Structure formats: structure tokens, C-alpha cells
Amino acid sequence: MIIFLFLLAFVPLVYAIPTSKQRRQARMRKRASHDALQVEIRFIPKMTADASEIVNTEGVLREMKIECAAYQLAFSKPLLNVPHVLLLKSPENRLNSMIKMFDGWGVRKEAEFRYLKERAAIFNFLQDLLSNINEDVLAVEFSSQRIGLLWGEKDDSEAVYLELVEVLKKLKTLTEETELIYDSE
């Protein structure tokens, strides 16, 4: 009886102990905050859901989402001409309800498509980037306040982290320079 009570009290504590992966992610996120990045846990639409995932057993539609970490870098000042753009990766090139931007990548709204197409420097950079970026990156997000890369954090190695930080810095600079040109016109 005493052993049972001990186990009853102890077992929930085991779930509170972080795993080695959770500890690595916490260290990486802490480092990101030191590198002026903001990290948020976000949910993005799952574009490759099959019929069994979209509808439950009662026939009610479910919104399929993927949990990921958004590593974001703030712009120097708000860029009012930048709409919210979510460029999503679609594995196996299944761009069901999306507008195709690049091979395996698309947006869900016409305004997002137009924004990226009209800014040739950003479009060309993304085209080169997305063809060889880490496969764990699931989305690229633009807003008037910041630029972000959303990824699954499966490969949380130093090299991948440094690559993502470098991409964010280049994309931030490119977006600010491009919007400066559009503001002056």
C-alpha cells in the first residue's frame, strides 16, 4: 500500500522533468533572445491533411494545424506597406488551396502573392533560399513589424540555428531596403 501511494505521488513528477530535446530547445531559444530574436510557439495550417484528418467521426470539419516555433526578427521601424504574408511549405508539392509561388511553396491569398511578385529582390532571394533551406523550415512570415521563419525544431543543431539567424538578418535587410525604395516612389 505504501509503495502504491509512493508511485501515485511520484509518477506525475516524472512528466514534469524536461527531456533532453526540451532542454536543448530551451537553450537554443534562450540564445535566440540574446541574438535579438523573438521566439513564439505558433500553429500554422496543415496543408497536406487527408480526409480522415479533416473530418471527425461525427462529420464535423476540423481545422488541421501544425505546431512550430516562430523565430522572428523585428524591423528597425514598422514597415506600413508590408501586409501579413505567410509563405507555406507544402510537402510533395500538394498545393491544394494555395497559390503556387515556388516549387513546393505557396500562399493562400492573392494579396500575399501580389506583394511578393511585385518585389523582385525579395522574390528572387526567396526563390534561391527556399530551394536549399533546411527541410525543417515550414513557413516564412512577413508582417509590418517583423520577419519570421517557422520551423519544427527537429534539427536543433548549432549549424542550423546559425543558418536561420543569417537568413533572417538578410531577409530583414532586404525587406527594409526594398520598402524604402517603395516609400520613396
Language-model regions, residue ranges each:
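Generic preference for well-ordered secondary structure
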Residues: A9-P12, A16, V55, E110, ...
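N-terminal signal-anchor transmembrane alpha helix of single-pass membrane proteins
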Residues: M1-Q38
